[in-house]
Amino acid sequence: MPGKIRPLIAGNWKMNGLKASLGELAAIGKGAGEVWRRVDLLICPPATLIFPAAAAMIGSKVAIGGQDCHAEASGANTGDISAEMLADAGATYVIVGHSERRTDHGETDAVVRAKAEAAWRAGLVAIVCVGETRAERDAGRAAEVVGRQLDGSVPDGARAANLVVAYEPVWAIGTGLTPTSQDIEEIHAVIRQNLTGRFKAEGEGVRLLYGGSLKPANAAEILALANVNGGLIGGASLKAADFLAIAEACP
């Protein structure tokens, strides 16, 4: 069994942030000193800010990541960005399979899997997102759906050092709604069982994040749950004070 898994608090800025927003990032970097002793911190800004964000965070305790990548390293893919480009700009992580990508862009598990493989090819850590819809949860299919997404989206060869899995129930993202603590624990147990079944000891050490209306008010309760090794934060990551408060709540 692995020792205590070091938590990761990751901020997904989504399609938010101009150059002026780097001030919030600087505030996160300034406030990260003590928190970093026990928690890893990551901000995933829009692609336009990755290079200046990474440059600004040199020497700090805050990593920078991308929000998506193309499966190919280069080519005629207008508007897309490759994992190699993200790495070249200073990113060390990339989110793949976020529900907004799956829903708005029709990304399948196979597409997400290819993107995770691309992340590894470029030396990035892949944050693979999974989660059920409200209808799927109401039908009692949440565990089944998440298990299927894991099987299809996480490539073979996953290791604790190159994979993070984020559970984000689709119905909780940006709605203010949150599953019960029992619901979160049950799905995180399903994820852990899936990963250890496939990857043995490596699967035991993969960090499992919870995302979906995670905020300072509920962070301590959620982050203390079994198999919850951090959070993927949306709106609350846009303000340094909120992001750092969530990080401080890690046990």
UniProtKB/Swiss-Prot annotation:
Pathway: Carbohydrate biosynthesis; gluconeogenesis; Carbohydrate degradation; glycolysis; D-glyceraldehyde 3-phosphate from glycerone phosphate: step 1/1. Its EC number is 5.3.1.1. Involved in the gluconeogenesis. Catalyzes stereospecifically the conversion of dihydroxyacetone phosphate (DHAP) to D-glyceraldehyde-3-phosphate (G3P). It comes from Afipia carboxidovorans (strain ATCC 49405 / DSM 1227 / KCTC 32145 / OM5). This is Triosephosphate isomerase. InterPro entries: Aldolase_TIM, TIM_sf, TrioseP_Isoase_bac/euk, Triosephosphate_isomerase, Triosephosphate_isomerase_AS. Homodimer. Belongs to the triosephosphate isomerase family.
